[in-house]
Amino acid sequence: MDKKQYAIIEKYALPFVQTVFEKGQQEDVFEKLSQIKAVFAETGLADFLSHIGISDHEKEKSLRLFQNSGSQLLDNLIEIVILNHREDLFYEIVLESQHQLEKISNEFEVTLRSVQPLTASQKEKIRPIIEQKMGLKVRSLKEELDSSLIGGFVISANNKTIDASIKRQLQVIKEKLK
């Protein structure tokens, strides 16, 4: 994506996010954007909307399926995107809107990689530690299993990482022995 395209995406995303905050609908809109993002990931809809061989009418029909989402703000954004024939940028607008919502509210989805799944009590205990160490609020905790860590965990959010894995500790020891 070039600077011109990013500027266009911001032109849609930033006023949308500002309005979402003015109306106090951050949680609801973020959840709906997450659902849209999941649909795009599962179906490859972003490629469909950006394909030059697909008619504007077909692209419009596809985007209209997301209207009546229960969020008037999101429905209005979709309508504006359709009216301005920017369907090909809709997925990027969704991603940028989510990013801006996270950035402004300082609430992030935290990814926690570990060898074994954490119990509910472990998740409850680690949440305040993550918030304190990373200086953010945890919107949700996404767990990923990674047997290559050997033990421990790796926490990632907002371009920050805490690596408390045995794999990393072994790498540090290896570097010191060189």
Curated annotation (Swiss-Prot):
Record has S-adenosyl-L-methionine as a keyword: no
Glycoprotein among keywords: no
UniProt feature coiled coil, ranges: none
Signal peptide feature range: none
GO cellular component, one term: proton-transporting ATP synthase complex
Disulfide bonds: none
SUPFAM superfamilies: N-terminal domain of the delta subunit of the F1F0-ATP synthase
Subcellular location: Cell membrane
UniProt cross-references to Pfam families, sorted A to Z: OSCP
Record membrane topology: Peripheral membrane protein
Gene3D superfamilies hit by this protein: N-terminal domain of the delta subunit of the F1F0-ATP synthase
GO MF, one example: proton-transporting ATP synthase activity, rotational mechanism
Superkingdom field: Bacteria
UniProt keyword terms in alphabetical order: ATP synthesis, Cell membrane, CF(1), Hydrogen ion transport, Ion transport, Membrane, Transport
Assembly, per entry: F-type ATPases have 2 components, F(1) - the catalytic core - and F(0) - the membrane proton channel. F(1) has five subunits: alpha(3), beta(3), gamma(1), delta(1), epsilon(1). F(0) has three main subunits: a(1), b(2) and c(10-14). The alpha and beta chains form an alternating ring which encloses part of the gamma chain. F(1) is attached to F(0) by a central stalk formed by the gamma and epsilon chains, while a peripheral stalk is formed by the delta and b chains.
Described function: F(1)F(0) ATP synthase produces ATP from ADP in the presence of a proton or sodium gradient. F-type ATPases consist of two structural domains, F(1) containing the extramembraneous catalytic core and F(0) containing the membrane proton channel, linked together by a central stalk and a peripheral stalk. During catalysis, ATP synthesis in the catalytic domain of F(1) is coupled via a rotary mechanism of the central stalk subunits to proton translocation. This protein is part of the stalk that links CF(0) to CF(1). It either transmits conformational changes from CF(0) to CF(1) or is implicated in proton conduction.
Entry's family note: Belongs to the ATPase delta chain family.
Protein's name in the database: ATP synthase subunit delta
Protein's organism: Streptococcus sanguinis (strain SK36)
Higher taxonomy: Bacteria, Bacillati, Bacillota, Bacilli, Lactobacillales
